[in-house]
Design a protein with these regions (language model features):
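Beta-sandwich strand segments
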Residues: 113-121
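C-terminal motif of bacterial Sec signal peptides marking the signal peptidase cleavage site
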Residues: 17-20
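Short, solvent-exposed loop/linker segments at beta-strand-coil boundaries, enriched for Pro/Gly
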Residues: 54-55, 62-79
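Interdomain boundary/hinge segments at the C-termini of tandem beta-sandwich modules
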Residues: 127-129
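N-terminal edge beta-strand
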Residues: 22-46
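Aromatic sugar-binding surface patches on proteins
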Residues: 84-91
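Bacterial N-terminal signal peptides that target proteins for export
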Residues: 1-8
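Glycine-centered tight-turn and secondary-structure capping sites
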Residues: 94-104
């Protein structure tokens, strides 16, 4: 009986170690005043309010030797069927490639407008990779 209980405990500990070490869901950040702190090879998401129906989108400028943009997708807010012009959230998923400090400069703009548009918005997120 003791051997059986020990085996069960051993399997449970092994399971917890494996699941505890699997990265899980990446952290999501929305506040540019807080520094994003991640480990090398870790992914994170910056989620920002947006409204794709206006033609505006978030454009990211970042150091490609330190960060990789894995994906960018827009998710509209829940709304009644048939509604148009509904806002949503733009999710920019990054992967930290190596240790260091960097910034992600984000501009909310209409891509076809040359130079600075009247309604453009700018945000800067600081990133520290350990």
């Amino acid at each position: 009986m003791r051997k059986h209980a020990f085996g069960v405990v051993l399997v449970l500990v092994a399971f917890l170690m494996v699941t505890g070490c699997s990265g899980g869901k990446p952290n999501t950040y929305t506040d540019p005043s807080s520094t994003i702190s991640v480990r090398s090879n870790q992914e994170f998401i910056i989620a920002l309010e947006a409204n794709a129906t206006t033609g505006f989108a978030w454009e990211a400028v970042y150091d490609e030797s330190i960060l990789q943009l894995v994906s960018q997708n827009y998710v509209p807010d829940e709304h009644e069927e048939g509604m148009v012009g509904v806002g949503g959230t733009d999710h920019l998923r990054f992967k930290a490639l190596k240790t260091g400090k960097t910034e992600i400069e984000l501009t909310y703009k209409q891509p076809w407008v040359e130079g600075e548009g009247e309604y453009d918005q700018h945000l800067t997120f600081k990133v520290e990779i350990k």
